[in-house]
């Protein structure tokens, strides 16, 4: 169920402060964050945000198509290693 329009989009305050500081200074260094639940705002466009996926920080370059989505959507937490191969098929 989507968030109520009455409440508005969510962003962690510590991340918002980091973004505003980076925009003011024009710094292109990636911003490290653990806040996967924060919504991407228009003032984040052009920044690189390193989002934690549980093991490491995944760099995410924010574009205009990402506005309104959550940061966690762009840092996958699970690695897919493929299904087990059939032993009979290998012998042939």
Swiss-Prot record:
Tell me if Ribonucleoprotein is a UniProt keyword of this record: yes
* Assembly and interaction partners: Part of the 30S ribosomal subunit. Binds S13 and L5 and cross-links to the A site tRNA.
Which key words are in the record?
Ribonucleoprotein, Ribosomal protein, RNA-binding, rRNA-binding, tRNA-binding
What is this protein's name?
Small ribosomal subunit protein uS19
**Could you tell me the gene encoding this protein?**
rpsS
Family annotation (Gene3D superfamilies) = 30s Ribosomal Protein S19, Chain A (3.30.860.10)
**What is the documented function of this protein?**
In the E.coli 70S ribosome in the initiation state it has been modeled to contact the 23S rRNA of the 50S subunit forming part of bridge B1a; this bridge is broken in the model with bound EF-G. The 23S rRNA contact site in bridge B1a is modeled to differ in different ribosomal states, contacting alternately S13 or S19. In the 3.5 angstroms resolved ribosome structures the contacts between L5, S13 and S19 bridge B1b are different, confirming the dynamic nature of this interaction. Bridge B1a is not visible in the crystallized ribosomes due to 23S rRNA disorder. Protein S19 forms a complex with S13 that binds strongly to the 16S ribosomal RNA. Contacts the A site tRNA.
Q: Which NCBIfam families match?
A: rpsS_bact
PROSITE patterns in the cross-refs: RIBOSOMAL_S19 (PS00323)
The UniProt entry's GO CC annotations, sorted and at most eight, read: cytoplasm; cytosol; cytosolic small ribosomal subunit
Task: Say if the entry is tagged with keyword Iron.
Answer: no
According to its UniProt entry, this protein's organism is: Escherichia coli (strain K12)
Recorded family membership: Belongs to the universal ribosomal protein uS19 family.
Q: Where is the signal peptide?
A: none
What highest taxon heads this organism's lineage?
A: Bacteria
For the biological process aspect of GO, one term held by this record is:
ribosomal small subunit assembly
């Amino acid at each position: 169920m989507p968030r109520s329009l009455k409440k508005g989009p969510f962003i962690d305050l510590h991340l918002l402060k980091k973004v505003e500081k980076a925009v003011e200074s024009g710094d292109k260094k990636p911003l490290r964050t653990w806040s996967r639940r924060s919504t991407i705002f228009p003032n984040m466009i052009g920044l690189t945000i390193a989002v934690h996926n549980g093991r490491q920080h995944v760099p995410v370059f924010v574009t205009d198509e990402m506005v309104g989505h959550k940061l966690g959507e762009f840092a996958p937490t699970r690695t897919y290693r493929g299904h087990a191969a059939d032993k009979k098929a290998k012998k042939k």
